[in-house]
């Protein structure tokens, strides 16, 4: 029976007959991306939000045992090395090391335990400038380490002796807020006192008000909720020294721009503003001219699409789409896939069809209750299902590195939407596949998007070379490696 898991997370047809269902997917971590998460961590975030990093007592005792001169790196619990092939999107660096930035040892410990070995290009450009206190306007591709680029200097500049809010990260979606806050918590876990709070719409406002009675150093929020808390006098932002706008193009679109203007007006005049996005339309330029002071501009966008993502299209009629999808499922070696539809109704209908075909499937869209969205997001991220059907809710910043295939079941109308959709695969320089089901009515949009993005979307071949999107890799425990 294919009932939508909206009462229990949205899961469709987990059956042993499904050819893709070969046990849980192993999530992987990458610099600036998400890393692995457990449901226990999700519950901790959901129930406490203001977090004294659950592990900090352990972390403090750990840091106190390290004496000057000790090789502190030997105490680290490093994840297995990710030996997958990476593209120049993340490997084309200047050769810097995280130690070159004179970061606190406790912060370095968190960085290395995330599996972040060396800074990516956006991190190399961003970290030293952000540490100097200068405003930044940064363009970088999706999935190249933007989160680490701003979280590392943000955490380094915290004064843990003070008990006020010192930094804010504003993101456009609730799922992205939870993801960024979890990364922040993990990176800062050895800092012994860094308190991170995630606050988003769709959660209990009273709980957030109570949490703000305690010490909070970093707030990661969606725009409407944090403005509400500021106006109520609960979130006191008169000591905020840094504000980050992640996915700035979305935050400064018509939906949010007035809210963002109102938030900025509540902050101290000498605050530092960091803007990060893959695209910067006119609205971002206008905001920059009004609020940023001599910003340092970073542009790592020689081309818009990720080098590791191969793009194909298949011409179909509307009635042929499900059959074509079934063929793709049977022929592709999918680790995890994200399938995009253009409406919530079509998401649910397609998820039901996929279930009937015998494949495991979650679905998620903006009309679902927040707690159900949270469960679907974290269950999919933890590899409990191979396929996720969704709307464009899932296009912004979401980092699930096990995803190697993105399918546009419904082709988008805007180049910006297309860019963010296909950026869900090929994360952090890895390989991925984007397949577009194109109807007669989509043909002009296809041509237009190719021209706007300066990319080539090829006709799908009868056989797709697995080396384009399947990462055959082996992870070995770090302690087994020889110097």
UniProtKB/Swiss-Prot annotation:
Region (RecA-like domain 2): 307-483
Residue ranges, annotated region (Gyf binding): 286-316
Post-translational modification: Sumoylated.
Keyword match Magnesium: no
Reactions the enzyme catalyzes: ATP + H2O = ADP + phosphate + H(+)
Record keywords: ATP-binding, Chromosomal rearrangement, Cytoplasm, Disease variant, Helicase, Hydrolase, Intellectual disability, Nucleotide-binding, Nucleus, Phosphoprotein, Proto-oncogene, RNA-binding, Ubl conjugation
Molecular functions (GO terms): ATP binding; ATP hydrolysis activity; cadherin binding; helicase activity; mRNA binding; protein domain specific binding; RNA binding; RNA helicase activity
Domain Helicase C-terminal: 308-468
Tissue expression as described in the entry: Abundantly expressed in most tissues.
One Gene Ontology cellular component: chromatoid body
Pfam families: DEAD (PF00270), Helicase_C (PF00271)
Span of the signal peptide: none
Cross-referenced CDD domains: DEADc_DDX6, SF2_C_DEAD
Motif (DEAD box): 246-249
Residue window of motif Q motif: 96-124
Annotated disorder: Intellectual developmental disorder with impaired language and dysmorphic facies: An autosomal dominant disorder characterized by intellectual disability, developmental delay, impaired language development, and dysmorphic features including telecanthus, epicanthus, arched eyebrows and low-set ears. Additional features include feeding difficulties, mild cardiac or genitourinary defects, and distal skeletal anomalies. A chromosomal aberration involving DDX6 may be a cause of hematopoietic tumors such as B-cell lymphomas. Translocation t(11;14)(q23;q32).
PANTHER family named in the record: DEAD-BOX ATP-DEPENDENT RNA HELICASE 50 (PTHR47960)
Oligomer and partners: (Microbial infection) Interacts with rotavirus A non-structural protein 2; this interaction probably plays a role in the sequestration of DDX6 in viral factories. Interacts with rotavirus A non-structural protein 5; this interaction probably plays a role in its sequestration in viral factories.
Role this protein plays: Essential for the formation of P-bodies, cytosolic membrane-less ribonucleoprotein granules involved in RNA metabolism through the coordinated storage of mRNAs encoding regulatory functions. Plays a role in P-bodies to coordinate the storage of translationally inactive mRNAs in the cytoplasm and prevent their degradation. In the process of mRNA degradation, plays a role in mRNA decapping. Blocks autophagy in nutrient-rich conditions by repressing the expression of ATG-related genes through degradation of their transcripts.
Name this protein carries in UniProt: Probable ATP-dependent RNA helicase DDX6
Origin species: Homo sapiens
Gene (UniProt): DDX6
């Amino acid at each position: 029976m294919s009932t939508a898991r909206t009462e229990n997370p949205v899961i469709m047809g987990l059956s042993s007959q499904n050819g893709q269902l070969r046990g849980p997917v192993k999530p992987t971590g990458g610099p600036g991306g998400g890393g692995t998460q457990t449901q226990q961590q999700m519950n901790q975030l959901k129930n406490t939000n203001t977090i004294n990093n659950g592990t900090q007592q352990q972390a403090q005792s750990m840091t106190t045992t390290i004496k000057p001169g000790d090789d502190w790196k030997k105490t680290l619990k490093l994840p297995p090395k990710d030996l997958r092939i990476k593209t120049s999107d993340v490997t084309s660096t200047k050769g810097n090391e995280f130690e070159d930035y004179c970061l606190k040892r406790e912060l370095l410990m968190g960085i290395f335990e995330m599996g972040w070995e060396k800074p990516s290009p956006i991190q190399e450009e961003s970290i030293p400038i952000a540490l100097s206190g200068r405003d930044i306007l940064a363009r970088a591709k999706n999935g190249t380490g933007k989160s680490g680029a701003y979280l590392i200097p943000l955490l380094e500049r915290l004064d843990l002796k003070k008990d006020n809010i010192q930094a804010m990260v504003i993101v456009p979606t609730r799922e992205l807020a939870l993801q960024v806050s979890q990364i922040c918590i993990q990176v800062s876990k050895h800092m012994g006192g860094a308190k991170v709070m995630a606050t988003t719409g769709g959660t209990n406002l009273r709980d957030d008000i109570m949490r703000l009675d305690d010490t909070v150093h970093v707030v990661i929020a969606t725009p409407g909720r944090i403005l509400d808390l500021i106006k109520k006098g609960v979130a006191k932002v008169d000591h905020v020294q840094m504000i980050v706008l992640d996915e700035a193009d979305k935050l400064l679109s018509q939906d949010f721009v007035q809210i963002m203007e109102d938030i900025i007006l509540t902050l101290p005049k000498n605050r530092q503003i960091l803007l990060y996005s893959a695209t910067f339309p006119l609205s971002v330029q206008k905001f920059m001219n009004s609020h940023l002071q001599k910003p340092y501009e970073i542009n790592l966008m020689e081309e818009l699409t990720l080098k590791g993502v191969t793009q194909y299209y298949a011409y179909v009629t509307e009635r042929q789409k499900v059959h074509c999808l079934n063929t793709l499922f049977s022929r592709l070696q999918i680790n995890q896939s994200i399938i995009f539809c253009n409406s919530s109704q079509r998401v649910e209908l397609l998820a039901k069809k996929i279930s009937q075909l015998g494949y495991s499937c979650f679905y998620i869209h903006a009309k679902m209750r927040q707690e159900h969205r949270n469960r679907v997001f974290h269950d999919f991220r933890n590899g409990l299902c191979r396929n996720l059907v969704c709307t464009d809710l899932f296009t912004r910043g979401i980092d699930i590195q096990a995803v190697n295939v993105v399918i546009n079941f419904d082709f988008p109308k805007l180049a910006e939407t297309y860019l963010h959709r296909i950026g869900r695969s090929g994360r952090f320089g890895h390989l991925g596949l984007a397949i577009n089901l194109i109807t007669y009515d989509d043909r002009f949009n296809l041509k237009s998007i190719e021209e706007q993005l300066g990319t080539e979307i090829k006709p799908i071949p009868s056989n797709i070379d697995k080396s384009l999107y399947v990462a055959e890799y082996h992870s070995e425990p770090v302690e087994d490696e020889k110097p």
